[in-house]
Amino acid sequence: MEYPLTLSKLSDSYFDYEWKAKEKIPVTIFQQISTVDDKQQVTVVLTAMEDVYFNFEERIRTDFRHDDCQFYLPGFWYRRNLRSPKEAPSFHTSDSWVVREDRLSTPLTGIFDEKQKKYMTVVRRAEYIQDALSTHKEGEVILSGTTSLGFTGFENLDGTAALAFGFPYKEAPKTYIRKLTLAPSVTAFQLLKKGESISLTWEIHEGKGEDF
């Protein structure tokens, strides 16, 4: 089941925010934001109140019109990928894409507004030491163990460009399984046992430039 979350600011707490759902959910989600070398470091800590399979996704809206933007995922996507065949990931298929981090040479997504000459990037900070098998390659899948792989990408939210990222991995609207082959989307769920916590960190950077 999918639970839309809202960010609630905290006071007198180690964390800056708590992600809350309208209904009771079996996990607490706290978020801390710090500034490191002019970059915002976002740390999310999930703690299970009972055994739960989870997939966490966060979106950060820019102030960029999606139609004014170019996009970058290292080794996978450049600008709008319109030079790629229609059977490959590109704007021919969709203007919103999220992919497994191991599709990329670096787990980074960049959005550049050509009119404002501004950009925003997100990069995951993690050690990639393990992966887990799943019985299926599409739809909602349960992982057999623990993975290090999350996802990253960009989305069109009502005409506004947004960074999208999360854990464990997800690929949408299609999965690129091999050269010139698009398959249905996949969302992986990992077990978090009662009392266990997982900490996830991403780094957000904003700036100005003439191009990528």
Q: Where in this protein do the model-derived segments appear?
A:
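Beta-strand/loop-rich accessory regions of lumenal/periplasmic or secreted enzymes
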Residues: 1-194
